[in-house]
Amino acid sequence: MRRPMTLFKRISSPALLALALFGGAAHAALVPPQGYYQGIEKLKTGDGNFRCEAAPQPYTGPLQFRSKYEGSDKARATLNAASEKAFRKSTEDITTLEKGVSKMVGQYMRDGRPAQLDCTLTWLGTWARAGALLSTDYNHTGKSMRKWALGSMSGSWLRLKFSNSQPLAAHQAEADLIEKWLTRLAEQTVRDWSDLPLEKINNHSYWAAWSVMATAVATDRRDLFDWAVKEYKVGANQVDDQGFLPNEIKRQQRALAYHNYALPPLAMIASFAQANGVDLRAENNFALQRLGEGVLAGARDPSHFKARAGKKQDMTDLKVDSKYSWLEPWCALYHCVGDTLERKHDMQPFNSFRLGGDVTRVYDPSAESKK
C-alpha cells in the first residue's frame, strides 16, 4: 500500500505546485469591464426632491403573455396593435421595475443620495421576497420577459456591486437576498433557452445569454459565465460571410432592425468575457465586427438588406439613437476610428435600461461630460 502513496507523493508535488500557480487564474473571481468600478460622480446633499414610489406589484403569476406579433405570418414582422396593447398592460409592472431600477441606480451613481439606493433595494427586495418571475408556467413571450427583466436588473446591479464607493457594504443581508433571487432567475433562464435547434436560435437567445452573463459576474458563478460564452459562440457562428444572421433575415421588412437588435447583447457578452480573460472578438472570423459593420452600412443604405430579405426595410428603429447602444462595448472591443467613432460621438450618451442603464458612463465616461 505504501508504494502507490510514495509514487503519488512524488508526482503530486509538481502537480500541486502547478495547481497553485495556475488554478487560481482559472478560478479567479469574475469581474465586469473597468467602467463598472466607477464611484459616485458627485455626492449631493439633501434629498433633491427624490421621492421613493411604491414598488410595483411583484409578478408571481404564470408568464403567459400575448405576443405583439400575434396573428402575423412566420416572418413575425407585422405588429398587432390590439395584442401589443394587451402585452403592454399585462407586463406593465415588470417593465416599471426594469425602468425604475435602472433610473434609480443611475441617479444614485450620479448623486449618491441614500434614499435613491434605499428605494432601489426596497423595490428589488420586494420582488425577491415574493419569488417573482420564477413561474415555470410560461409561453415564448413569457420566458422572453423573464430574461429581459433579468438583464435589466443584473445589468443595473453590477454598477452597485462593483462601484469603488461600495454602496452595498452596509446592506449585505438585503444584497444577498436579491442576489439569490437573481441567481434563481438566471438558472431558470438557462433552462428556458438551452438546447434549442439552430433554426430557433435568434436575438432572444443572445439576450438570454446577456442576462445570464450579467448575473454570472454579479454573483461570481463560473458555470453561468461559461453558458453565456457558449451561447455567444453559437450566435457568432450564425453570422455568415456577408455579416447577415439568417434567422433575422427571416424578419423580412424588419431584418435590419433585428440585426441591430441582436448586437447589444452580443457586444456586452464579448466585453464581459474579455474582462475575464476570454477573447471572443475573433470568433468565426471576427463575426461580431462583421455584424456591426453590416448594420452600420445598412443604416446608411439598406439596399443590401432589402435584396437579401426580399422586402423594403422598415427604418423606424434605425433612426433612434438609443438603439445603437451596442456601439459602446463594440467600439471598446474593436477600437472604432473615423466615421464610426464620429457617429458614436454624435449619438452619445447611450442609455439602455435593458443593458443596465447608462452605457456611455461605463464605457466612455469622458464623452458624457462633454454633452
Curated annotation (Swiss-Prot):
The keyword Lyase applies. GO terms for cellular component: periplasmic space. Residues 1-28 form the signal peptide. One of its GO terms (molecular function) is poly(beta-D-mannuronate) lyase activity. It catalyses: Eliminative cleavage of alginate to give oligosaccharides with 4-deoxy-alpha-L-erythro-hex-4-enuronosyl groups at their non-reducing ends and beta-D-mannuronate at their reducing end. This is Alginate lyase. Catalyzes the depolymerization of alginate by cleaving the beta-1,4 glycosidic bond between two adjacent sugar residues via a beta-elimination mechanism. May serve to degrade mislocalized alginate that is trapped in the periplasmic space. GO terms for biological process: alginic acid catabolic process. It is an enzyme of class 4 (lyase). It comes from Pseudomonas putida (strain ATCC 47054 / DSM 6125 / CFBP 8728 / NCIMB 11950 / KT2440).
